[in-house]
């Protein structure tokens, strides 16, 4: 009868054989260690016998055979030619014995104990030779030398054993897993006629390396995210401004803290005017200081083609004045306010060839009595259907409803009634088509954190009108740099990001985190902006923003080591695991100037490693020298009269009252026209018909 063995039996047998083989190997190693340690003690005994021979002889501890043997060894090997030779031999075998010791690992052994034992043992063991030449008795010299030699040997033995017992924990060398999470990054500088190139330093496997962030396709838009102080403007936005001016871009800069970015743009333009085929005009919108501001009419009749343009202008302005309206689209009072303001803007556009079509005129017209506003507006067929909800309430004498509808637009707009705002909004120093090949512009719009809710409405209107004008074919390449994006609402920004690439419009948006953008732009629009941006830079951010970015950067295969410590040895197992490339904790703890992110590439400019985690290198000395050489922004508008005095306040106020007078005169003319027409006169209140 045959004997059958199962696969399990064979496997168990192999494991038992392997364990037995391992045990035999350990026993053999232990024997070698004991032998090495014994040799060390043997050399130590030989050393004492040779160099303390006189003392041992007086004690009757010498032997003729041993004497002859040692003399023969000395003649052939010169082992005793110097005391250091035998000491080194003893020390060598001591070290081998300690290295191979199968000792109990103890994490509580401190390095200071090892250092103390070694510092005590080395002098006692190697530097005690002077004791043999002391002017003392032979017994004292022998005993003192032997005791110090033995004590030194024991101290060195203790240091060696403790060093072996000192449990080395490889994971503690990299407690934050920095080396394992480091990765090779792009080290080539890939440049083209629109790229932004930033030098970097990054760590890979514990070593600093030089790299480059090459944004070769700026037309796929860029988001620069980071908490205050993370270095967004200094490291990224400033470089976008400088490098795009150097490459001949027309530009819009939204300068939230005027004039930080404006000063950079102006001075850099002065140095690089030769990069433009047509010299660009440098324009500024600054409501705080009319001296340093151009004037521009954002609702210029020449650039409004139909009533939808008026609706967009009204919508943007009111949403900037009431950020909560972003989530109230479709609400009765919200839509009523937008429609009424849009109707007024379009009315001013079609009246007298649009000579009164400015936003201050629209505000002043809205402040007229209702019994004048509605008859005038409804007397135009283009607005009759547009205003039907208001006219129904007007004809049915629903005054409470009508007053509520009008108040919903009048109250927020009343905050914009300001002589300085009126001054800037009623002029025509330039047009908003900044990428016009015949008249390119560098336009800087300045806000003021103390008045951002008021200025933001006008600036949001400028920006919204501008992006509709520049996102067209056949224009110059242009760059939009928007710092602190949530402080203004720009309608159509999501559409611009999605379509601007074909029209050579670069968009660079700076903001603090995604939640801030969702609060001021609404969840849906914010998600579209976030998900359609092709290039992203992020400094330190926390919470959901850090988690979203970490997921966006994906995962990488990492090497994992597991250490199991026992009384016998340390067992190490190694495996690979798919882990997050840049974890949330890293993004949440980035230092100033360190950025993570990714870039988009082109068909003919491939970037294999698009993701980066690096410090953007800024030559601080060079930047300081450039800043020190900057010239101040000159006055754009002069209010100096013939008497040599500055009459800015008087001129600005005169313009303010002129707008009011224009509207009052316009209303009188329109009422007279309506009264003279039998059909239209029915639109007037009954008291007017008598």
Whereabouts are the PLM-identified features?
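Conserved ATP-driven motor cores of ASCE-family P-loop NTPases powering translocation/secretion/packaging/pilus
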Residues: 497-499, 503-600
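Basic- and hydrophobic-enriched, low-structure N-terminal and domain-boundary segments
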Residues: 14-230, 234, 239, 247, ...
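Acidic, Ala/Val/Gly-enriched low-complexity intrinsically disordered segments
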Residues: 7-10, 19
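P-loop NTPase motor domains
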Residues: 7, 58-61, 168-172, 176, ...
């Amino acid at each position: 009868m045959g004997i059958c063995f199962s696969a399990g039996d064979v496997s168990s047998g192999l494991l038992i054989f392997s364990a037995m083989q391992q045990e035999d190997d350990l026993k053999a190693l232990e024997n070698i260690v004991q032998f090495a340690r014994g040799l060390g003690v043997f050399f130590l005994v030989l050393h004492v016998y040779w160099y303390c021979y006189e003392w041992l002889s007086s004690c009757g501890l010498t032997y003729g055979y041993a004497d002859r043997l040692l003399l023969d060894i000395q003649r052939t090997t010169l082992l005793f030619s110097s005391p250091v030779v035998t000491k080194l031999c003893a020390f060598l075998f001591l070290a081998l014995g300690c290295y191979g010791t199968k000792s109990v690992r103890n994490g509580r052994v401190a390095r200071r104990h090892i250092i103390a034992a070694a510092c005590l043992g080395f002098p006692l063991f190697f530097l005690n030779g002077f004791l043999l030449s002391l002017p003392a008795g032979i017994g004292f010299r022998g005993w003192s030398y032997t005791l110090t030699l033995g004590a030194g040997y024991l101290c060195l033995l203790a240091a060696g054993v403790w060093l072996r017992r000192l449990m080395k924990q490889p994971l503690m060398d990299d407690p934050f897993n920095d080396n394992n999470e480091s990765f090779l990054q792009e080290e080539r500088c890939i440049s083209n006629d629109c790229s932004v190139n930033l030098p970097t330093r990054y760590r890979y496997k514990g070593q600093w390396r030089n790299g480059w962030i090459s944004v070769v396709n700026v037309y796929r838009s860029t988001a620069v995210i980071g908490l205050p102080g993370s270095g967004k403007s200094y490291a990224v936005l400033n470089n976008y401004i400088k490098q795009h001016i150097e490459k001949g871009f027309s530009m819009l800069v939204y300068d939230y803290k005027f004039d930080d970015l404006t000063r950079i743009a102006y001075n850099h333009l002065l140095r690089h005017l030769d990069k433009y085929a047509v010299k660009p005009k440098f324009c500024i919108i600054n409501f705080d200081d009319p001296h340093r501001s151009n004037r521009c009419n954002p609702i210029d009749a020449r650039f409004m083609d139909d009533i939808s343009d008026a609706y967009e202008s009204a919508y943007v302005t009111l949403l900037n004045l009431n950020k909560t309206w972003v989530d109230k689209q479709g609400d009765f009072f919200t839509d009523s306010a937008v429609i009424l303001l849009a109707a007024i803007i379009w009315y001013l556009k079609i009246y007298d060839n649009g000579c009164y079509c400015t936003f201050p005129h629209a505000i002043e017209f809205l402040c007229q009595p209702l019994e004048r506003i509605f008859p005038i507006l409804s007397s135009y067929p283009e607005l009759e259907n547009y205003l039907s909800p208001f006219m129904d309430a007007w004809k049915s004498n629903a005054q409470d409803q009508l007053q509520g509808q009008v108040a919903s637009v009048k109250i927020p707009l009343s905050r914009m009634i300001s002589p300085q705002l009126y001054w800037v909004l009623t002029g025509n120093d330039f047009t908003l088509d900044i990428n016009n090949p015949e008249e390119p512009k560098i336009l800087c719009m300045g806000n003021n954190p103390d008045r951002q809710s008021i200025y933001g409405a006008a600036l949001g209107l400028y920006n919204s009108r501008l992006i509709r004008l520049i996102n067209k074919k056949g224009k110059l390449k242009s760059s939009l740099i928007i710092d602190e994006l949530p402080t203004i609402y720009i309608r159509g920004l999501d559409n611009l990001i999605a379509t601007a690439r074909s029209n050579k419009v670069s968009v660079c948006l700076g903001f603090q985190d995604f939640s801030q953008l969702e609060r001021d732009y609404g969840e849906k629009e914010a998600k579209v902006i976030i998900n359609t941006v092709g290039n992203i830079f992020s400094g330190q951010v926390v919470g959901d923003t850090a988690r979203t970015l970490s997921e966006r950067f994906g995962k990488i295969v990492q090497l994992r080591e597991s250490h199991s410590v026992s009384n016998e040895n340390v067992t190490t197992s190694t495996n690979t695991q798919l882990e997050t490339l840049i974890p949330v904790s890293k993004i949440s703890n980035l230092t100033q100037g360190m950025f993570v992110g990714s870039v988009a590439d082109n068909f003919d400019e491939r970037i294999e490693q698009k993701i980066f985690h690096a410090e953007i290198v800024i030559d601080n000395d060079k930047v300081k020298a450039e800043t020190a050489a900057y010239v101040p922004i000159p006055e754009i508008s002069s209010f100096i009269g013939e008497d040599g005095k500055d009459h800015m306040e008087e001129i600005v106020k005169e313009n303010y009252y002129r707008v009011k007078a224009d509207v009052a005169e316009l209303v009188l003319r329109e009422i007279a026209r309506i009264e003279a027409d039998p059909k239209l006169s029915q639109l007037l209140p009954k008291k007017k018909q008598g």
